[in-house]
Amino acid sequence: MPREDRATWKSNYFLKIIQLLDDYPKCFIVGADNVGSKQMQQIRMSLRGKAVVLMGKNTMMRKAIRGHLENNPALEKLLPHIRGNVGFVFTKEDLTEIRDMLLANKVPAAARAGAIAPCEVTVPAQNTGLGPEKTSFFQALGITTKISRGTIEILSDVQLIKTGDKVGASEATLLNMLNISPFSFGLIIQQVFDNGSIYNPEVLDITEQALHSRFLEGVRNVASVCLQIGYPTVASVPHSIINGYKRVLALSVETEYTFPLTEKVKAFLADPSAFAAAAPAAAATTAAPAAAAAPAKAEAKEESEESDEDMGFGLFD
């Protein structure tokens, strides 16, 4: 009987993962190292209605995906990334929103001897509150200290553990004595699967504004190269036309040949004082309508106030 129950459970698991792969176009492959059952339950509750978390043995997940490749060949891209303690987070919502929800469910954790550090750990300069009898402990770790008012004071920031290092017993003891929980554990996104494409989670940090600025930078680079080699493109043609017009204008100014667009330029070059006089006149012409509009508004306001006053007093005449 237990064997049959196990077989039934496997069959149901295969059906479930295939159903999720069919129903949800997007998913995360997440690492679940150091995530306990209580934290996993909290993550599932916070994602309820927005995403579905599925964990399982790697061999079973690979077998289920391989059996479904006929219907969805794009799933083969998932297989190389199913290694280690991983699972899936399926969703139809915005991937950035789900990513942020997973990050919000990380919990701080104390350093344990033998654990692999997921991040760098630095002990800040501080008064530890520990008695002088612990001085030798700090010296063994190469931490410079002094005794201040009967307690040990760390003089400068100390990099205690590097990313990827194994936490030693002394480092773990020190961090616990200082009440420092340097690590945070949760579901870590390793890969993103989106409608048949798979990519690194860093792509989610790229905003529309960043894409727009990168695109404009690319267009400028293309235009610059095309102008240099004389190869016309959509990006370079406007600049080529303007540069050509400038050359024709310069040639016309230097020669007797004139066309309508150069007559005004030649006139200003012949008499620069006319250009100096034209600039204030143009500014005055622009400012005149605005200046005329201001008194008109003031007069209209006064008339409105007078009419309001007449209406108010006229009721009692």
Curated annotation (Swiss-Prot):
Compositional bias of kind Acidic residues: 302-311
Covalent cross-link Glycyl lysine isopeptide (Lys-Gly) (interchain with G-Cter in SUMO1) as placed by the record, residue numbers: 297
Positions bearing Phosphothreonine: 59
PTM annotation, UniProt: Ubiquitinated at Lys-264 by RNF14 and RNF25 in response to ribosome collisions (ribosome stalling).
InterPro entries registered for this protein in UniProt: Ribosomal_protein_uL10, Ribosomal_uL10, Ribosomal_uL10-like_insert, Ribosomal_uL10-like_insert_sf, Ribosomal_uL10-like_sf, uL10_eukaryotes
Keywords carried by this UniProt record: Cytoplasm, Isopeptide bond, Nucleus, Phosphoprotein, Ribonucleoprotein, Ribosomal protein, Ubl conjugation
Cross-link (Glycyl lysine isopeptide (Lys-Gly) (interchain with G-Cter in SUMO2)): 297
Subcellular location, record wording: Nucleus; Cytoplasm
One Gene Ontology biological process: cytoplasmic translation
Ribosomal protein is among the record's keywords: yes
Main location: nucleus
Modified sites of kind Phosphoserine: 304, 307
Region entry Disordered, spans: 293-317
Residues with the Phosphotyrosine modification: 24
Cross-link Glycyl lysine isopeptide (Lys-Gly) (interchain with G-Cter in ubiquitin) residue location(s): 264
One GO cellular component term: ribonucleoprotein complex
Family according to the record: Belongs to the universal ribosomal protein uL10 family.
Quaternary structure, from the entry: P0 forms a pentameric complex by interaction with dimers of P1 and P2. Identified in a IGF2BP1-dependent mRNP granule complex containing untranslated mRNAs. Interacts with APEX1. Interacts with FMR1.
Record-given protein name: Large ribosomal subunit protein uL10
Organism: Mus musculus (Mouse)
